[in-house]
């Protein structure tokens, strides 16, 4: 078959259409329509099949992107899905939530002049279509080794570890405190980015592969780590980072101030019918003037959730300029379309409260961009005399996350760093092995809060380390 080498000129990049704005703003459903078969084939055909594919190297799991784009263009969906799963445990999830503009698509040779290949949406199409057509991972040639591994945490790192172990004949048993798998994929990422049926289907697939899940089971409460270490040949910790970071602001504990993650988790549990808990109470922003402090993707999740809860007005306040905002440009664009007001170069100084002690606004100061910090990002420097109050009824703090307390881990000789992260070097003889040789760890609890795909990559590498340790 002759190839049109100028296909990227003849056919421009096309993204999937979004649902109508009036529907998006009131529903917790994914806003992007899926590609049709014709759209997926045509967009996949734009790939140049570069000899040195930068997209593949920029991807943390090093997906065989040009290869499965070619298969998608040829309509060979089962083969594309099989190839996709060779490197990625959750390709249909990454196709939805990865910041492709900063990873594969941002590195596409066509990106600057012609528009990158729509890699993420084709990845989603390939795997959704394959599942719809009945494709499932084939483990018929896998021989059981008799080894068993306990995995604590059913988030992306834990699921990735379980996937690789299972494909190599090791029995994986996954423990998680939530009533569904996915961790923050399910309970932290709102349904307008990742519908929850995606993870329900994924649990069915994993169960069919032989992975066992023990949900609503919290280590330290329902099961003890000491018992797991006796019962299993190794233990993997993929517990994430759940402790919200605060800004040290005046009155930040006042009624009406909320941490981002409990707010998002409780909202999702409400939608899924799981109810609320004392540490994650459901909060409705209906009729309220909401201010979300922070500029990352979690902040975008909070402002867009508030819109769908029918907030009266929603502001995202960030201390740097838009260029230095860490959140996905795509998510910022979506939030703007949905009516969110962005205030850049404003530094929160404190929460204002009324006579009843409830939130009535946030005291801000304007900032200007200074010299770069240690990470290369320009510092936000307060402009003297620029203090002002922005009225509001609710404040959500989205300043990031750090490791939560793990008292159940303290007696098991696992070293932590100064920030409370587990020390588990990738470059050790057994990748991601901790100071307790029987315990491995990966994902956010090792590297700090990061992307879904980096957690998947580390979970898979940790599984390789475990296989090496078990000599299987």
Question: What are the functions of these language-model segments?
Answer:
Residues 68, 92-94, 101-152, 213-288, ...:
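FAD-binding core/adjacent interface of flavoenzyme oxidoreductases
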Residues 253-287, 372-449:
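FAD-site-proximal beta/loop scaffold in flavoenzymes
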Residues 283-320, 380, 388-394, 401-403, ...:
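Long hydrophobic segments that form regular secondary structure
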Residues 208-229, 276-282, 345-393:
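A structured beta-alpha segment of the ubiquitous adenosine-cofactor-binding alpha/beta core
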Residues 41-72, 81, 85-119, 153, ...:
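Cysteine-centered iron-sulfur cluster-binding motifs in ferredoxin-type domains/subunits
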Residues 302, 445-471:
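A conserved FAD-binding loop/helix module that cradles the flavin
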């Amino acid at each position: 078959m002759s190839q049109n080498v100028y296909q990227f000129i003849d056919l421009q990049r096309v993204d999937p259409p979004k649902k109508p704005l009036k529907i998006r703003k009131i529903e917790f459903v994914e806003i992007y329509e899926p590609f049709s078969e014709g759209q997926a084939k045509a967009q996949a055909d734009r790939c140049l099949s570069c000899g040195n594919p930068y997209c593949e190297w920029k991807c943390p799991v090093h997906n065989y992107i040009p290869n499965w784009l070619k298969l998608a263009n040829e309509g060979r969906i089962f083969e594309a899905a099989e190839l996709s799963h060779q490197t990625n445990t959750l390709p249909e999830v990454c196709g939805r939530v990865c910041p492709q503009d900063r990873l594969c698509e941002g590195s596409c040779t066509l990106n600057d002049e012609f528009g990158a290949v729509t890699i993420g949406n084709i990845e989603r199409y390939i795997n959704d279509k394959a599942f719809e057509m009945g494709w499932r991972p084939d483990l018929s040639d896998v021989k059981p080794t008799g080894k068993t591994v306990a995995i604590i945490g059913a988030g992306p790192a834990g699921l990735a570890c379980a996937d690789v172990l299972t494909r190599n004949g090791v029995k994986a048993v996954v423990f998680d405190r939530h009533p569904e798998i996915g961790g923050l994929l399910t309970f932290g990422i709102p349904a307008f980015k990742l519908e929850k049926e995606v993870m329900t289907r994924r649990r069915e697939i994993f169960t069919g592969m032989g992975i066992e899940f023990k949900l609503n089971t919290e280590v330290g409460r329902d099961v003890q780590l000491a018992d797991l270490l006796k019962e299993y040949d190794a233990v993997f910790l993929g517990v994430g980072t759940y402790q919200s970071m605060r800004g040290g602001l005046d009155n930040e504990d006042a009624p009406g101030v909320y941490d981002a993650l409990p707010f998002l988790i409780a909202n999702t549990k409400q939608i899924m019918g799981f109810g609320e808990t004392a540490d994650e109470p459901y909060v409705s922003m209906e009729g309220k003037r909401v201010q979300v402090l922070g500029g990352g993707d979690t902040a975008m999740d909070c402002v867009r959730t508030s819109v769908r809860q029918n907030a009266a007005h929603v502001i995202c306040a960030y201390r740097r300029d838009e260029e230095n905002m860490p959140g996905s440009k795509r998510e910022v664009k979506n939030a703007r379309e949905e009516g969110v007001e962005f205030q850049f170069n404003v530094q929160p100084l404190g929460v204002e409260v009324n006579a009843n002690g409830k939130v009535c606004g946030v005291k801000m100061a304007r900032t200007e961009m200074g010299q770069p910090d240690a990470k290369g990002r320009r510092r936000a420097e307060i402009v003297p005399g620029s203090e002002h109050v922005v009225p509001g009824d609710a404040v959500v703090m989205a300043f990031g996350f750090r490791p939560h307390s793990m008292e159940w881990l303290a007696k098991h000789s696992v070293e932590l760093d100064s920030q409370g992260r587990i020390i588990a070097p990738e470059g050790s003889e057994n990748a991601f092995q901790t100071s307790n040789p029987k315990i491995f760890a990966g994902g956010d609890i090792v590297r700090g809060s990061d992307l879904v795909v980096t957690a998947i990559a580390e979970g898979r590498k940790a599984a390789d380390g475990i296989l090496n340790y078990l000599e299987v």
